[in-house]
Curated annotation (Swiss-Prot):
Molecular-function GO term, any one: glycine hydroxymethyltransferase activity
UniProt xrefs under Gene3D superfamilies: Aspartate Aminotransferase, domain 1, Type I PLP-dependent aspartate aminotransferase-like (Major domain)
Reactions catalysed: (6R)-5,10-methylene-5,6,7,8-tetrahydrofolate + glycine + H2O = (6S)-5,6,7,8-tetrahydrofolate + L-serine
Pathway per the UniProt entry: One-carbon metabolism; tetrahydrofolate interconversion; Amino-acid biosynthesis; glycine biosynthesis; glycine from L-serine: step 1/1
Record family assignment: Belongs to the SHMT family.
Organism field: Campylobacter hominis (strain ATCC BAA-381 / DSM 21671 / CCUG 45161 / LMG 19568 / NCTC 13146 / CH001A)
Subcellular location: Cytoplasm
Site (Plays an important role in substrate specificity): H224
Main location: cytoplasm
Annotated protein name in UniProt: Serine hydroxymethyltransferase
Binding site for (6S)-5,6,7,8-tetrahydrofolate: L117, G121, H122, L123, E241, S349, P350, F351
Length: 415
């Protein structure tokens, strides 16, 4: 009997129920992945006990000689991964990383130009309900009806707005982002260029997506999603002047003592990302997503932008009589988890939507390849083409569980 099972069986049992859900269902939420046992092992270590306010070699607390080495290792691996000169590995999340960037580069009230949330952006790119849209004067660009960014349109908006900072990057954009064009736009109006690569970072470091360096002044990311590490954030730059401002913005500006056990998890994750196997994984993520999208289009479904260049697709139901929420619920009943998502030309509320976002990273981590993704796409189509057929959903759920049992990801809940 484990310590947790003995002391708090309620939480132990719920954790194991979640393990069973992760094992039995097909996880296709684009922002989720399955991290490595080694990452979870170090995150559950005694490192959680240590306070380490400050940075390596410049701490406010004593006894930091070993955690200094851990954080410096994470920094060095991060720099090597992205090919940059400076990295801050302390942000507790991607959202905090983004707020840290704003704190370093602009002042409250300054203008920012980001991707509209309903067009594929993120809350932290200036949405009015988020701190980024409350502390700063936020303006937006979006996608055209073909689902793609029109860079000439972005340039026109930038000339009118004259932002201090432009945000490029997205949470639901299936096409490659042209950082070079964004830099031309930023330079034309004298703006800083900030790339949020949280979704595509795992592809970037494998050479499967253009690197935001040297085009961007600053880059942020999460460390989970396509990087497959622990939940957390990072900020990177090539300029020492910017690095100093970023460090001050994170500590003492936003955070106190960093989560040392998570920083260690980031270091372990980065070691995986630096391995030769990572390039193979990233290629497979893209290949799996492509056949997923191609198969759904063959079955008559509309994909935003007509396909994908990365790890996700957006399926539009604007021409259907059901919503993204309906589709998400039906698929979950069939053992497939996705999320409802707004699409270009959206007519429904953000709580209902007219689309779903579907990702390939997590199932690729389980070892699935094109054959499995083609099968899954056909099952998704079967469910959606008869969306109210609960008997069919139950039948497919059993088939999904059988497939999932052949690709075991974890044999226990705690490491």
């Amino acid at each position: 009997m484990s310590n947790l099972e003995n002391f708090d069986k309620e939480i132990f049992d719920l954790t194991n129920k979640e393990l069973q859900r992760q094992c039995d269902y097909l996880e296709m939420i684009a922002s989720e992945n399955f991290t490595y046992p080694e990452v979870m092992e170090v995150m559950g270590s005694i490192l959680t006990n240590k306070y380490a306010e400050g940075y390596p070699g410049k701490r406010y607390y004593g006894g930091c000689e070993f955690v200094d080495e851990i954080e410096q290792t994470a920094i060095d691996r991060c720099k090597k991964l992205f090919g940059c000169n400076f990295a801050n590995v302390q942000p507790n999340s991607g959202s905090q990383a983004n707020q840290g960037v704003y704190g370093a580069f602009i002042k409250p009230g300054d203008k920012i130009l980001g991707m509209d949330l309903s067009n594929g952006g993120h809350l932290t790119h200036g949405a009015k309900v988020n701190a980024s849209g409350k502390f700063y004067s936020s303006f937006f660009y979006g996608v055209e009806m073909d689902g793609r960014i029109d860079y000439n349109r972005v340039a026109d908006i930038a000339k009118i707005v004259k932002p201090k900072l432009i945000v490029c990057g997205a949470s639901a954009y299936p096409r490659e982002i042209d950082f070079a064009k964004f830099r031309e736009i930023a330079d034309s109006v004298g703006a800083f260029l900030f790339a949020d690569v949280a979704h595509i970072a795992g592809l970037v470091v494998a050479g499967e997506h253009t690197n935001p360096f040297p085009y961007c002044h600053v880059v942020s990311s999460t460390t989970h999603k396509t990087l497959r590490g622990p939940r957390g954030g990072i900020i990177m730059t090539n300029e020492e002047e910017f690095a100093k401002k970023i460090n001050s913005s994170i500590f003492p500006g936003m955070q106190g003592g960093p989560l040392v056990h998570v920083i260690a998890g980031k270091a372990v994750g980065f070691k995986h990302n630096l391995s030769p196997e990572w390039k193979t994984y990233a290629k497979q993520v893209k290949a799996n997503c492509k056949i997923l999208g191609d198969t759904l289009m063959k079955r008559g479904f509309d994909l935003v932008s007509g396909g994908t260049d990365n790890h996700l697709i957006l399926v539009s139901f604007l021409k259907k009589d059901y919503s993204g929420k309906d589709a998400s619920n039906a698929l979950e009943n069939a053992g497939i988890t996705v999320n409802k998502n707004t699409v270009p030309g959206e007519t429904r509320s953000p709580f209902v939507t007219s689309g779903i976002r579907v990702g390939s990273a997590a199932l690729t981590s389980r070892g699935m390849k094109e054959k499995e993704f083609e099968w899954i796409a056909n099952k998704i189509a079967d469910v959606l083409n008869d969306i109210n057929n609960t008997s069919l959903q139950s039948k497919i759920k059993a088939e999904v569980k059988e497939l999932a049992s052949k690709f075991i990801i974890y044999d226990k809940a705690m490491f």
